């Protein structure tokens, strides 16, 4: 039985760096919202206990891929708690639409979809809290995808408060470069002391991203993409980049601008949604 599972993108509608811990991790305040756009995972349960990724990613060993690591992590957690049915395994393939290094959470979303889907298909019965805790061992952004609701995040991104920001339309553009997260977070000029504010205060302020100035300075493609988008609508960086986005009140307005996109810009239009398409598929 082949099953299909959404693995949606996310946007950071704002991102503020509030400090840096002794272990080097940055503390932040950010607002996550999902998009009705993303990858699709195809998962076929096996009965021999094997995990096979049928669509390898160039340059990434299968055992290092977050998809495989998530599947093996769930298998281990369920086995240790006596909740793994004998022979549980899976063939997994992916239809990839989200760019690597784009700030859309593609890898984290893939991992979360595997955790949620296999917990369902294998009938392990792990709670959302257990899955989120497991997800955090794979990456700071995985828990928000596991929980499946737009959220205000603090700490290193793991302290989540569900929120319901307006569900606007977005033109999301990838400028053709990959930005490794450490490149931004290790930059000495990155703002690291933005004052912490309450969620109510932040939702009333104009949204921005502390990483944007560094991304624009170090990657001229990001600067060019944002300069173009800002001619049409409020626009900013998502995550540490490289993707940028402009917000619109209606789909036709977003698509009208998309039609004028320069050839060097890879862009798409999607709606912001507060309930993840993954979790909507489970309803």
UniProtKB/Swiss-Prot annotation:
Homodimer. The lineage of its organism: Bacteria, Pseudomonadati, Pseudomonadota, Gammaproteobacteria, Enterobacterales. Catalyzes the phosphorylation of the position 2 hydroxy group of 4-diphosphocytidyl-2C-methyl-D-erythritol. ATP binds at residues 99-109. Belongs to the GHMP kinase family. IspE subfamily. This is 4-diphosphocytidyl-2-C-methyl-D-erythritol kinase. Keywords: ATP-binding, Isoprene biosynthesis, Kinase, Nucleotide-binding, Transferase. The keyword RNA-binding does not apply. It comes from Salmonella arizonae (strain ATCC BAA-731 / CDC346-86 / RSK2980). SUPFAM superfamilies: GHMP Kinase, C-terminal domain, Ribosomal protein S5 domain 2-like. InterPro entries: GHMP_kinase_C_dom (IPR013750), GHMP_kinase_C_sf (IPR036554), GHMP_kinase_N_dom (IPR006204), IspE (IPR004424), Ribosomal_Su5_D2-typ_SF (IPR020568), Ribsml_uS5_D2-typ_fold_subgr (IPR014721). Its EC number is 2.7.1.148. The active site is at 10, 141. One of its GO terms (molecular function) is 4-(cytidine 5'-diphospho)-2-C-methyl-D-erythritol kinase activity. The gene is ispE.
